[in-house]
Design a protein with these regions (language model features):
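A Zn2+-metalloprotease active-site environment signal
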Residues: 1-182
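Single conserved hydrophobic/aromatic residue that forms the stacking wall/gate
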Residues: 183-188
């Protein structure tokens, strides 16, 4: 006679149903957390899904800035060029709403002369590589690049990306958990 314990084992319909319910709960919880994180961006006026506070964004950017700078050769050694980048960035802040935000903007010219790039971290650190800087011909072009990066910060693009990652991880976690349950039950 088969014991009732064996009939209700991992591979049984009851065990499988419970695992499906757990996976479904994980998915629903992830979607609800994502949807409940909506807010209206004060600068852009757009509805966004962000899971970080502005303070958390600033802390994340300040924490990540040294490592990111190091990956691109650190700050450029030319004080005149470094000063121009900072001055143009500050002019943009002084003449736009971005300067009235709580973000901790900083503007750094990086020494990397091979990678043509500019980027912003959450909370305000803005970087431009010397490879891109050296290709710009006017202060207006530099302002365009820095303004674009400032726009990413005030539009909270990094915070939106992190919220989407959390949603994706929650859904993927449920799928992986469900798949591993299937694999484990097939080995018994």
């Amino acid at each position: 006679m088969i014991s009732s314990r064996r009939r209700l084992g991992r591979g049984s319909a009851l065990g499988g149903s419970a695992k499906w319910l757990i996976a479904l709960f994980m998915i629903v919880a992830s979607v609800l957390a994502y949807c409940s994180s909506s807010s209206i961006n004060d600068i852009t006026g757009e509805k966004q899904y962000v899971s970080l506070s502005v303070e958390q964004e600033i802390a994340l950017g300040l924490q990540s800035a040294p490592q990111m700078a190091a990956e691109f050769g650190g700050p450029d050694a030319n004080p005149q060029d470094q000063g121009e980048v900072k001055q143009v960035g500050q002019k943009i802040l002084a003449s736009t709403e971005a300067g009235q935000t709580p973000y901790k903007f900083s503007f750094t010219l990086l020494a990397d002369d091979q990678t043509i790039n500019a980027f912003a971290l959450p909370g305000g650190p803005v970087f431009i590589t010397s490879a891109l800087y050296d290709r710009l011909q006017t202060e207006g072009q530099l302002a365009g690049v820095l303004g674009h990066e400032i726009g990413h910060v005030v539009a909270r693009h990094s915070a939106e990306h992190i919220a989407k990652q959390k949603l994706t991880q929650g859904i993927a976690g449920a799928a992986v958990d469900r798949k591993s349950t299937r694999l484990n039950s097939s080995h018994h």
